[in-house]
Amino acid sequence: MSDEKLSEIWYTRCPVPTPVGLAAQLGYLEETFAAEGIALRSIIDSPDPAIRQSHFNHTLNWSFRHGGNVPPIRARSEGRKTRLVGITWTDEFQAVITLPQTGIRSVSDLKGRRFGIARRPEGIVDFHRATALKGLVSALSLEGLSHRDVEIVDVAVRDSVLDKFGDASLFGLRRRPPHGEEIAALIRGEIDAIFVKGTPGIAVANLIGAVLVADFGFHSDPNIRVNSGSPRLLTVDELLAEKRPDLVARLIEAIFRASEWAKAH
């Protein structure tokens, strides 16, 4: 244990159910670090965009994150000193959908058709695009096809995943329903199919009366199911891991407490 005195520690999580989110809501995280004289600060609640972007690129010292795996993988590949300390896996709805008028009814029907994938501005990692690409690859593999068997059409999205001018109460993220641009392109006939996931994906599919081309979020093969949210990663910055491993241990204890609470309720 280091003698270095800390006054605050930063945390962040994706806006989906996670053990870290539950531990924060139950007060376990704040209680854990308060016992060490350390204040708990939320990265995504900060009014400072430079701090909020650490949710995606893990640039902030003395911080930890629990969420999708694409940002930490990208951050690590770019030389960020981030360390993996835990993995959770929660399966969710993943599907390729289309509209009735396209005539697409199965994965094999996707061959030669236009698959729309959103493309956001360069800068912060476009994890939405990575997620859709993996979803496409998984769906096509069910019928022995690859991404080369379809025409990938970029659907331009003006906003980055991080809105630097956003209201901090929205965590600096665009909280409008997802897939808006892709759905619009689908309705205009500019593309033939898209990937959706999670409860928002179910809502979108029902809203437009979509045809379910492939549903693989609960497939028996984990290589098919794996995507940005499966698994989710618990990461800490290198300084925290090396200088205060005792705090990392306390963090994991708090997360386990939240898990036990969830099992009991």
Language model features by range: what are they?
Residues 37-39, 168-171:
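Glycine-rich phosphate-binding "P-loop"
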Residues 70, 161, 169-265:
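Pocket-lining segment of extracytoplasmic ligand-binding domains
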Residues 4, 8-147, 152-156, 163:
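Short, glycine-/small- and polar/acidic-enriched structural segments
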